[in-house]
A protein has these predicted regions:
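N-terminal small/polar-rich segments of proteins
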Residues: 28-115, 144-184
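Hydrophobic alpha-helical transmembrane segments of integral membrane proteins
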Residues: 10-11, 154
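Bacterial N-terminal signal peptides
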Residues: 11-22
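N-terminal secretory signal peptides that target proteins for export/translocation
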Residues: 1-7
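Terminal beta-strand-rich extracellular "head" domains
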Residues: 104, 113-141
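Bacterial Sec-dependent signal peptides at the C-terminal "C-region" and cleavage site
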Residues: 22-28
């Protein structure tokens, strides 16, 4: 009988331990950090608001192009397939000049390429278009626009075309292009 008493006490202990493990205590989430940013805009300045993103692209054995227009519409030619939900968007810039001021805008004329992160494969960017009325193709030569807002604040999108090679190597591609403004 002593053995059955010990088994009963042991079994009660196991049941009690199981019940205690099943009781949940309030969970306390650890603190999380986030970032805060501000841009102080001075007269005769401008800054990048958004990056140019071409989104997700599936290459094939045939070369093709992907264009993101200044209005955000994405189109393709040739042997590429576009996936939705890739975050595609034109680059956006904003700044401040004076009302009715003329501004010269140009694009650095060096070859503009995206290079595969961790690799050497490239894709070429071309036909940069500023979202104005009418739209203007950006080159190394100055193009001009007028600041129409009475506050002098302006913004504009820039789209471009990406050349995707046949059987382009998969991966993330990144690069830069430089837009220059000269206030007249």
């Amino acid at each position: 009988m002593a053995l059955s008493h010990y088994l009963r006490v042991l079994l009660q202990g196991i049941v009690l331990a199981a019940m205690m493990l099943g009781v949940s205590a309030p969970a306390i989430a650890g603190p999380q950090r986030t970032e805060a940013q501000a841009v102080i805009v001075t007269p005769l300045s401008f800054f990048k608001v958004d990056d140019l993103i071409f989104g997700r692209i599936l290459p094939s054995s045939t070369a093709g192009t992907v264009t993101v227009a200044p209005d955000g519409v994405r189109t393709k030619t040739g042997g590429v397939t576009l996936f939705n939900g890739g975050g595609e968007q034109p680059s956006r810039f904003a700044g401040r000049g004076a009302a009715n001021q003329i501004v010269a805008i140009s694009l650095t004329s060096t070859p503009n390429r995206l290079t595969r992160v961790g690799g050497t494969q490239t894709m070429t960017l071309s036909t940069f278009v500023i979202g104005s009325t009418p739209t203007v193709v950006l080159t190394g030569t100055n193009q001009f626009f007028r600041i129409n807002n009475t506050s002098g604040i302006f913004n504009f999108p820039v789209g471009a075309t990406l050349a995707v090679g046949p059987n382009q190597v998969a991966g993330n591609y990144a690069g830069t292009f430089v837009v220059t403004l000269n206030y007249q």
